[in-house]
Amino acid sequence: MKTITIPRQNLTQYEIMLIMRPDLPEEKFLKFLSEIKEHAKRNLALEFNLSNRGRRKLAYAMRKFQDGIYIQFNFLGSGYILNSLIKRLKLEESILRYIVQKT
């Protein structure tokens, strides 16, 4: 397999905040988080940091849910990594909302 090296100066720091369904079973939740970590590593994301912000009440109902589980990802990567992660997030039905920020 050919190794790809990306110059560090071409990488950008990104933050993704997710709101997930509160009724999601623990094993599916943990499986989703591990899949996202593996996806980021496969696509050469550097300094990948994941933090669970916990369950919080939403300001307004989303898909009839009053609560949501907040997850925050921080990573250093290229636009390709970001686009592949966004495609993966769009396929996940348990995500109520997400936002991407360049930090």
Curated annotation (Swiss-Prot):
PANTHER family named in the record: MITOCHONDRIAL 28S RIBOSOMAL PROTEIN S6, SMALL RIBOSOMAL SUBUNIT PROTEIN BS6M
Subcellular location: Plastid, Chloroplast
Gene that this sequence comes from: rps6
Domain of life: Eukaryota
InterPro entries named in the record: Ribosomal_bS6, Ribosomal_bS6_sf, Ribosomal_S6_plastid/chlpt, Transl_elong_EF1B/ribsomal_bS6
Keyword Transport attached: no
Gene Ontology molecular function, alphabetical: small ribosomal subunit rRNA binding; structural constituent of ribosome
GO BP field: translation
SUPFAM superfamilies cross-referenced by the UniProt entry: Ribosomal protein S6
Family assignment from sequence similarity: Belongs to the bacterial ribosomal protein bS6 family.
Role: Binds together with bS18 to 16S ribosomal RNA.
One Pfam family here: Ribosomal_S6
Full protein name: Small ribosomal subunit protein bS6c
Cellular component aspect of the GO annotation: chloroplast; ribonucleoprotein complex; ribosome
UniProt keywords, alphabetically: Chloroplast, Plastid, Ribonucleoprotein, Ribosomal protein, RNA-binding, rRNA-binding
rRNA-binding among keywords: yes
